[in-house]
UniProtKB/Swiss-Prot annotation:
Protein name per the record: TLC domain-containing protein 1
UniProt KW keywords: Cell membrane, Membrane, Signal, Transmembrane, Transmembrane helix
InterPro entries assigned to the protein according to its UniProt record, in alphabetical order: TLC-dom, TLCD
Gene name, Swiss-Prot/TrEMBL: Tlcd1
Main location group: membrane
Keyword Cell membrane: yes
Compartments (UniProt record): Cell membrane
Amino acid sequence: MPLLFHPAWPLLLGATLTFRALRRVLCRLPQPAHVQTDPLRTWRWHNLLVSFTHSIVSGIWALLCLWQTPEMLVEIETAWSASGYLLVCFSAGYFIHDTVDIVVSKQTRASWEYLVHHVMAMGAFFSGIFWKRFVGGGVLTLLVEVSNIFLTLRMMMKINNAQDLLLYKVNKYINLVMYFLFRLAPQAYLTKFFLQYAGQRTLGTFLLAILLMLDLMIIIYFSRLLRSDFCPERAPRRQQKDKFLTE
């Protein structure tokens, strides 16, 4: 079947439009007073609300997929389920939406790291969507969204200058645990699996290259998280206006 007429396109379009509609709904919700005074913070707040929703849905969905189809933990290339396939399409739609939102809102320069991440994620997910291979790998990758629930909550509190809240202080320790369990551990497991494709000229080799770049980004983000929350005196000083965009 020609790629142009692949039945996954309506799923991707539907997922993308769903997140677009969700953003419109979330924009109508009351905002913290501190956020309302700054257009950039307002945009970022709405962006994070959508991200927070995606993380909750896809994180729980990924756990359910692995519970329903545990062979995805071992047969990463060949294991497949309708639920896992729809999850990958759902998350790809989010990344498409967020990429468009960043570009249209002229936040490309401030959010270029997110764009790089989204492009790599979409490149990896499309292998599962259009060729129905490595769907299990896509589901395992989306375990990271469980960690993102707490990371996004952290960023939302920082935007609102709420670092002194007890919730923020408790959340930073939860973040460490979740980062290890749902970000570092799955990433290490996937990297070990995909190393078998090193030196080949296959789809697995392409995904290995993406995975290694994501590994580097994850390590960099982890070091920033540690500096910002546990060694603030060592964290690089930035203008307060755009600090929340990258930390």
